[in-house]
């Protein structure tokens, strides 16, 4: 089980990303658009720098829904490999069976 503080920190980051998503996307589009004036792009970059660091989507870490484990994460199931194997063996994940050939 991951430290509760790490899990909570990641949840706070998710909330910040959600709150600033629209503003972040708008400013990023202006800053990356080469057809815009250079000063307008610079202003957008400066405004992007004022947004909190944790509002950047790349700072959010994918974590297991059960344990909060950050590594060996399967996006499709939102679980780490340990929990995926455990729940699949117990038959709690529909459509997942142990491979046999």
From Swiss-Prot:
Q: Which SUPFAM superfamilies match?
A: Glucocorticoid receptor-like (DNA-binding domain)
Ribosomal protein recorded as keyword: yes
Say yes or no: keyword Protein biosynthesis present.
Answer: no
Q: Which Pfam families match?
A: Ribosomal_S14
Q: Name one GO biological process term.
A: translation
Keyword annotations from UniProtKB, A to Z = Ribonucleoprotein, Ribosomal protein, RNA-binding, rRNA-binding
GO annotations of cellular component type: cytoplasm; small ribosomal subunit
State a single Gene Ontology molecular function: rRNA binding
Signal peptide per UniProt:
none
What subunit structure does UniProt give? Part of the 30S ribosomal subunit. Contacts proteins S3 and S10.
Q: Which family does it belong to?
A: Belongs to the universal ribosomal protein uS14 family.
Q: What does this protein do?
A: Binds 16S rRNA, required for the assembly of 30S particles and may also be responsible for determining the conformation of the 16S rRNA at the A site.
NCBIfam families (alphabetical): PRK08881.1 (NF006477)
- In Swiss-Prot or TrEMBL terms, this protein is called Small ribosomal subunit protein uS14
């Amino acid at each position: 089980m991951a430290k509760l503080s790490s899990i909570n920190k990641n949840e706070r980051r998710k909330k910040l990303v959600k709150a600033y998503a629209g503003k972040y996307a708008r400013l990023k589009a202006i800053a990356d658009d080469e057809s815009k004036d250079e000063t307008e792009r610079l202003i957008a970059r400066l405004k992007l720098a004022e947004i909190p660091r944790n509002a950047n989507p790349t700072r959010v870490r994918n974590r297991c829904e059960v344990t909060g484990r950050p590594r060996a994460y399967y996006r499709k199931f939102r679980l780490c490999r340990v929990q995926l194997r455990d729940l699949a063996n117990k038959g709690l994940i529909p459509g997942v069976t142990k491979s046999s050939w």
